[in-house]
Amino acid sequence: MMEDLIGELIPHQGCAITRIDEGIKVAGSAMNWVLSAALAPLVVRAPLAFRVVGMTDSTNLRLYWHRGIVILNWECDVRELRVHDPLTAEQHGLPGKGFITTNEWHEVLWEIRLDSMRVVVDGELLFETKGNYAGIESAPSVGPCFGSAISVREFNITPLL
């Protein structure tokens, strides 16, 4: 597995990154529709595994890669998992799949292969789809939204074979 990038994340779009004992705290700009994020200082291509161990204080633990987004504790319905396709930005809503307990650590794994992707949270497969992700290059990031704050203990990008 690639080294933990937690100490190298760059604040983006008004994001504030604060060191805490167990990692970092990421707070947004407190402006609605501004997607503040802690951005990795590298561009990656599929196939990859994007892994975050993080928590939210309320809503919106979000992972970003290109046009794709994984949203846990979505502000409109905390129980609905939201997944936006990295190639097409098509939005998928999965009722009953998106809630994580607040102020507790959760492992979020977003595997993006050349022809498919899947989202696994705390060891449970929550979403899987087909797609052509071979030509995408982008920097992964993690962030809060709409007033939430998140904490991140681990941020890893691993090439998949």
Model-derived features: where do they sit?
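Low-complexity, Ser/Thr/Pro/Gly-rich disordered linker/stalk regions
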Residues: M1-R45, S116
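Short, exposed beta-strand/loop patches in secreted or surface proteins that constitute
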Residues: G14-R19, I24, V70-C76, W110, ...
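Secretory/extracellular carbohydrate-interaction modules
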Residues: I24-D85
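Beta-strand-rich interaction surfaces with strong enrichment in secreted/lumenal proteins
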Residues: V34-L42, L94-I100, S141-G143
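Short tryptophan-centered beta-strand motifs in secreted/extracellular beta-sheet-rich domains
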Residues: F50-V52, N103-V121
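Beta-strand signatures of extracellular beta-sandwich domains
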Residues: R62-Y64, R118-V120, N156
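Short, aromatic/His-centered strand-loop micro-motif at the edge of beta-sheets
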Residues: P86-L109
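Flexible glycan-contacting loops in extracellular carbohydrate-active proteins
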Residues: L126-N156
